[in-house]
Amino acid sequence: MNLDIKKWKEFKVSSVFTIHNGKGITKEEIEENAGNFTVVQSGEENNGVLGKIDRNYCEVMNYTFSDKPCLTVARSGSAGFVSFQADGCVVGDSAKILLLDEEIASNEVYTFLQTILSANRFKYAYGRKVTESKYMNDTIKLPVQYNEDGTIYMDASKKYSDDGYVPDWQWMEKYIK
């Protein structure tokens, strides 16, 4: 499969993902409320995983979590580090959860987007934090959908871009498979 990025178009991260900020979880909480639910913070080691906690505890504490596959991005520390969590996770205050719409979310699409987002990591080097406004307005280049006649498909609702481009989710999935 050819990877011709010259035809890719720019999309704001906020138009592709729903972004959720984490809330403070301590190591003590993880130890005292042990479980099977993955806790992600800002480190790169172990894919950002800090430990495992009881999922019900996370719900009671109103922590930010996803039961479905998602990406996480470190806000500080290893700022900009993106990890894929196939079984969902809860994030502490040093991380964010990035979710795709259910109809397009697949492990393969998440893996593709993880790689694309990781290419932007340099923007958060030298102590620059991943702030919400900065990350929401960050742009990534993605393959776009085409009509049968070879012209770019344009979405009148402009859900993903102000120009009407639509990411080619199927292409991303096939590329990873």
Where are these regions (language model features)?
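A structural detector for beta-sheet-dominated domains
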Residues: 6, 14, 74, 101, ...
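Glycine-anchored helix-breaking recognition loops at helix->coil/strand junctions
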Residues: 94-95, 113-159
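General detector of folded, globular domains
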Residues: 6-13, 39-40, 70-72, 83-84, ...
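Extended intrinsically disordered, low-complexity coil regions enriched in Ser, Thr, Gly, Ala
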Residues: 59, 110, 130-132, 170-177
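Short, flexible loop/turn elements at secondary-structure junctions
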Residues: 41-44, 77, 102, 144
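Intrinsically disordered, low-complexity regulatory regions enriched in Ser/Pro/Gly/Thr
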Residues: 31-32, 65, 131-133
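Non-catalytic DNA-recognition/assembly elements of restriction-modification systems
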Residues: 1-24, 31-48, 150-177
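A short beta-sheet element
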Residues: 51-118
